[in-house]
């Protein structure tokens, strides 16, 4: 079963049958339109490419426009690809949120909020150094980042200050609380990566 591309609407809460408040993220999943079907013979692997939403005509490049026209679908806000195994798809086919009707848990992938350049305390949860007792300059600095003559360098991958966020993040095994096919909404328990209105990819959970 493939996944779908949606839009993070925001968070709210609903009450279950026992009256317990459940925090949920609302994901709007409009119909995903098939723009290309990749086959083993032509592409070396099997996959389906989809788009969703819409894009202003003056924002669509000529190569994109030709691609959408060939598929016979309206220009969407992006292109995403899902590997397939035995499933049959046709150009222009629409795939809706109701494919998750019988799914218990999903994996959600999004782009995390960008935080810019951050220090080691915020980025890697380093502990701070002493606030007093003679420390006047090094409260939030990293401390030692290597040794001396041996090895005489800083190892690659050392946790240091740098750019935080704005990267692809996947949260696994989120419980599907509700599928509202009429309003094209999927409610999952807990939070998902990214800002409001950000694109998210929803797939059946790998570890479910």
From Swiss-Prot:
Coiled coil: none
Origin: domain of life: Bacteria
InterPro entries (alphabetical): Ribosomal_uL3, Ribosomal_uL3_bac/org-type, Ribosomal_uL3_CS, Transl_B-barrel_sf
Modified residues (N5-methylglutamine): 149
Keyword annotations of the record: Methylation, Ribonucleoprotein, Ribosomal protein, RNA-binding, rRNA-binding
GO cellular component, one term: cytosolic large ribosomal subunit
Modifications the protein undergoes after translation, according to the UniProt entry: Methylated by PrmB.
One annotated GO biological process: translation
UniProt-listed PANTHER family: 50S RIBOSOMAL PROTEIN L3 (PTHR11229), LARGE RIBOSOMAL SUBUNIT PROTEIN UL3C (PTHR11229:SF16)
Main function: One of the primary rRNA binding proteins, it binds directly near the 3'-end of the 23S rRNA, where it nucleates assembly of the 50S subunit.
Subunit note: Part of the 50S ribosomal subunit. Forms a cluster with proteins L14 and L19.
Protein name: Large ribosomal subunit protein uL3
Organism in which the protein naturally occurs: Haemophilus influenzae (strain PittGG)
